[in-house]
Amino acid sequence: MIINTSTKLITILLSILLVISVVPTIVHSQSNYKPPHDKPGPAIDILRFRAFHVDIAPQEILANQMDMYYFGLKVAAAKDIRDSPGIKVHEAPTSTISLLLNPAPGPEGQLNPFSIKEVRQAVQLIINRDFVVQEIYQGMAVPMLTQVSSYDHDYLTLYDMILESSINYDPDYAKFIINEAMTNAGAELIEGKWNYEGKPIRIDFIIRVEDERRDVGDLIRSEVENLGFIVQPTYQQFGPAIYTVYSSDPNLVGTGGSWHMYTEGWGKGAADRYDSGTLNQMCSPWLGTMPGWQELGFWQYENEELDLLGQRIFSGNFQNEEERNSIYVDASKLCLDESVRIWIANIITNLPADDSIEGISLDIIAGPKSLWTQRDAYIPGKNDLTIGNVWVWTERTTWNPVGGFGDVYGNDIWRNMYDPPITRHPFTGLPIPYRANYDVTTSGPNGNIELPSDSFMWNSETSSWSNVPVGSTATSKVVFDYSKYFASKWHHGEQINMADVIYSIYQTFDLTYNEDKSLMEFAIATVSKPYLDSFKGFRIVDDNTLEVYVDFWHFAPDYIADYASITSITMPWEILYSMDTLVFDQRKAAYSDTAAQRFNVPWISLVMDRDARLVRNVIREHNSANNIPDNVFNVQGLQLVSDSDATSRYDSVLSWFDEYGMLVISNGPFMLYRYEPPAQYAELHAFRDENYPFKPGQFFFGEADLVDILDVDSNIIEIGSDNEITVTLTGFGRASAEVGAVMIVGGNINHFTRVMTTA
C-alpha cells in the first residue's frame, strides 16, 4: 500500500543500511566452554520449568527461585534489574506484536468496517509506532510494517518497498479515508459515531494483558474511538484470547463473544536467512493462519494472488535469488496493501539469567531461547536448572505432534525433548544438519531427475505403498542418513528404526489424501496438500538411509534438504498409530482444536491424564489383539515390523504410562518426568542412553561476533556526481557487510552504491 500523506518529504535524506552476515569464530567460542562431564546427553541432570508472573519475576530470580526467565521482562523492570549482582540480562529480538483485523462481512444487516480494505488501510495510519517503540517500550523495540523487521535477514530484500510505502502516523488522513469508505458502504456518522441501518457500529477488541500489549491495545482503542467507532475492549490472557480468535468462525463478527480486532504476539524460533514460512504464515490464506483458518464451514479470507506468490516462495518456484527476492517483494507489498494483519513492533526481549550459567548459545533472533542453550547450560557445582516462564500450561497448551504444539509455552519445554533432523544455524540462519546427515542432488531449477523403478509413494485408495509410474521425475533428490537416530533409543527404551520414519510419512499422506480422514481433520489436510503434492517418491536404500524425491529447488542447497525432510521423527510409531486409531477409527478425540470443537471430542494432549489414558487404552487393545498396520510396514516386500517387535513396543509404552502417567515419548537429551498443569510445573530428566549421539559442547556456539557501526562520515551529497561515504566498523572474527546507500529526494529513491566490506 502506497499512501500519499499530507506531509511531503522535501528534504534530502541519506540512509545507510548495513546488513551483516556473520561468519562466527566458533573455535574461539568453544574454547571458552568446559563441559561438566563427557556423558551422553545434556550438561545437567534435571531441568525444571515453573510459572512466575512477569511482575514478580525480577524478585524471584534475585531470590534464586529460578535461574533464567523465558518471558520478556517489562522494560522498566529490566532496567532496574540490569545492574543487580549475579544477574545478566540477555537481549534478543525474539518477540513481535501485530494487530489482527477481522475482514469477514458479518451477519446480514450488519457492517463490519474491517471488511472494507480502505478502512483496514486507514488503520495503518492510526498506529503510532514511534510512540509504541519510544514510550511504551522505552526504546527497547523497533517499528515494523511487514512480517520482517530490521533484525531479520530479509529486511534488506524489502527495504526499498518499505520506504516507498510512505506509511506514517497520520490520524487526520486516516479519518478522511474512513469517512469516504464508510459513507460509500452506507454508514452514517451521527453525533460523531458511525451507524449502520440505524444502529451504532460497535468494535469488539480483544486485548492481551500479560505484557505491554495492554498499553498498546489501549492506545489503539483510543485512536479507533477517535475515528467515530464505539469500541468494546475485552482484556484477556493467552488461553481465552486464543480460543476466541483462532477457534471461531470470523463471520460471527458482531455477535456475542466474537471479535473485530486482536493484539497478537509472536515468538521467533530462530534466525532464517531466506524466509518462506513467515511470509506465508502471516500473509497467505492457504497456510491456515489467516482468518477462517482453513476450517470447514468457516468463512474464509481469500486472496488467490497472495496464495500464488506465497506458494512460489514456499515451493522454490523461481529461477535464481533475484527472482526469489522479486516474488518476496511482490507478496509482501500485496500483504501490506491488504492490511489484514498490521505489524506494530519487534520487541527487544529482556531475558534475565544467573550470570554464573555456563554454556549459553545466543541465537541472533531467539537469544538464549534457542534449541542449543539447555543442552549445554549448567551452573558449576550444580546438576539442575530452573527456567521460569509466565505459563507452563494454558488452556491452549496441547501436546500432540500432529495438530498441537501451537503455543510458545509448551514449545519452550518440548524443544528440549526431541532432536530435529535439520535445524538453523544460530548466526547465519541457514539450515544445517543436526541428527540426520544429508546429501543433495538437484537438476533445478529447470531440469529433472528420473526416479528409480523401486521408488514408492503412499496410495490412499489402495491403502498401500505403490511403485511410482515408470518415467517419473523430480527436480531434486535428498539422501537422508538417519544412523544417529537409529543407533540410539526412544525414551522408553525401544530402538529407533526405519519403521518410525515410514509410519510418520504414511500418517501425513493418509491424513491428507484419505477422503474420510481429510474431512475429519479438514484444516490440517487442506494446509498440508500443496506441500505434499511436491513429493514424487521415496526409496529405502538400506537400514539407515532414505532417498526423497521432490519438485523443489533452491539456490542454497541446504534449503532443499530442509524442505525434503518430511518427518521430524518426534514420537515412536506405536504412539502415532494408537492416536490415529483413537481419532479416525474410534472418533473419541481430535488432532486439531477446530475438529475437536466440531465433533465435540477432546483435543488430544498426551500430557493430560484423560487423553493419555484414552491412548493407553487403545495400545492395550492393539497389544491384546496383536494389531500391526501391516499395510504400512510392508514396503516393497520388506516387512519393517514383526509381531515380537510390536509386542515389545506396546509393552514399553504401557510400562512408561504406569510409571509417569503421560505418553510423551521422544528421543532428545531430556525426557519428561513430571507435568503438573494445576501447579504450573514441569520437570525434565536427562536421557543418558549410552548410544545417544551428542555430549555437552558438541553444538556450543556461544555468541555471534557481530560487527557494530562506529561512525558514518560523509560530505554533502552532490546529485549527479561521484560521492564517497566512509563507514567505520568494529568487531571480532570475520564478517561480510553489504552497505546500500539510498538517497531519497522528494519521495523518489535512487541507488548510488552497493559495496562489500570486511571488518
Question: Could you say what each language-model-derived stretch is?
Answer:
Residues 29-45, 77, 83, 113, ...:
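Surface-exposed, Gly/Pro/Thr- and Asp/Glu-enriched linker/hinge segments
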Residues 32-36, 48-107, 265-269, 275-281, ...:
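Extracellular/periplasmic solute-recognition and catalytic clefts
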Residues 50, 58-64, 110-122, 450-517:
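Aromatic- and charge-enriched surface segment that lines or borders ligand/interaction sites
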Residues 58-62, 66-78, 84, 226-289, ...:
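Periplasmic binding protein-like
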Residues 121, 125, 133-136, 167, ...:
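Extracytoplasmic/peripheral linker and loop segments enriched in polar/acidic and small residues
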Residues 137, 389-473:
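N-terminal lobe/hinge region of extracytoplasmic solute-binding protein
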Residues 143-188, 207-215, 319, 670, ...:
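Structural transition elements
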Residues 278, 282-283, 290, 351-396, ...:
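Long beta-strand-rich cores associated with HINT superfamily self-processing modules
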